């Protein structure tokens, strides 16, 4: 291979690239063409007057990755051919084919809209690009102003980025599913947390404010507030030398809470 990789890493890279291709609804020829364009653009850059070699280390590393990607694409073509021979489809392929079908044939959406007049989409921050295109083609783009589509989601809880999910789909929802007349769909916030005390919410707000600037730029997320009945919380910060040490501390902490409650004749927190 163009870069040194263990066989297990090659398999992981292949599956990851293949999943991203399905999620973004592109085939190997499209990726290969873009990959070649990037290589040619880099090779065509003017060289430094006193450069000792044609490419800097960073440029050579980039080219090696491009060549490696080409090699992965060849393997993906073979992998997909084998899948077809065996009559298999994975979830990513099914989703990409469904999205392509809904885009290319408007009658599919017409049929679905005739059956479903109210559409509720939960955990929308965990949808991928192909899912977004699929749902938009079926129920969005202002094709039926009398149709009701509602999405619920929290971009701060997006946990499936590794499989292609994008919290920015929430931001796109407003224009993918516009209100009557073409205006952006309205947004309503559920700002009361019924499961967390205020101290935990304050800490979470500080944490996400520093780590999620890209998401916050795309989707404005107000801070949550505790319910009036929320109790106070104790926040502990610990560093452990191993995972086993962490497990032991957590188990002992809960053991102490239960033992104390038992001695006092009360229910544990």
Regions found by a protein language model. Give the residues of each.
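Short helix-terminating capping/connector loops at secondary-structure junctions
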Residues: 4-5, 111-114, 143-146, 181-185, ...
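Coupling/switch/interface segments within P-loop NTPase motor domains and analogous charged loops
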Residues: 1-81
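Conserved helicase NTPase motor core
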Residues: 18, 48, 57, 61-172, ...
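A general structural signal marking secondary-structure boundaries and capping sites
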Residues: 25, 105, 142, 177, ...
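Phosphate/oxyanion-binding loops and surfaces in catalytic or ligand/nucleic-acid-binding neighborhoods
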Residues: 14-24, 28, 41, 45, ...
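Short, well-ordered amphipathic alpha-helices
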Residues: 135-139, 170-175, 249-262
């Amino acid at each position: 291979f163009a870069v040194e990789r263990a066989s297990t890493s090659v398999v992981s890279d292949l599956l990851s690239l293949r999943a991203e291709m399905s999620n973004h609804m592109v085939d190997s020829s499209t990726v290969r063409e873009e990959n070649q364009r990037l290589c040619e653009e880099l090779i065509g850059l003017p060289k430094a007057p006193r450069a000792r070699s044609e490419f800097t280390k960073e440029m050579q590393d980039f080219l090696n990755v491009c060549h490696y990607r080409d090699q992965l694409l060849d393997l993906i073509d073979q992998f997909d051919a084998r899948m077809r021979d065996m009559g298999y489809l994975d979830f990513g392929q099914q989703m990409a084919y469904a999205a392509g079908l809904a885009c290319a044939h408007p009658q599919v959406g017409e049929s679905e809209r005739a059956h479903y007049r109210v559409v509720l989409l939960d955990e929308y921050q965990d949808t991928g690009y192909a899912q977004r295109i699929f749902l938009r083609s079926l129920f969005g783009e202002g094709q039926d102003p009398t149709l009701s589509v509602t999405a619920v989601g929290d971009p701060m809880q997006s946990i499936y980025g590794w499989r292609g999910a994008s919290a920015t789909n929430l931001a796109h929802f407003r224009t993918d599913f516009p209100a009557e007349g073409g205006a952006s769909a309205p947004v309503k916030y559920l700002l009361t947390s019924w499961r967390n005390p205020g101290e935990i919410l304050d800490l979470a707000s500080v944490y996400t404010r520093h780590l999620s600037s890209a998401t916050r730029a795309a989707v404005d997320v107000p801070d949550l507030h505790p319910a009036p009945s929320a109790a106070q919380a104790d926040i502990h910060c610990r560093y452990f030398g191993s995972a086993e040490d962490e497990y032991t501390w957590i188990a002992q902490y809960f053991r102490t809470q239960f033992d104390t409650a038992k001695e006092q004749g009360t229910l544990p927190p």
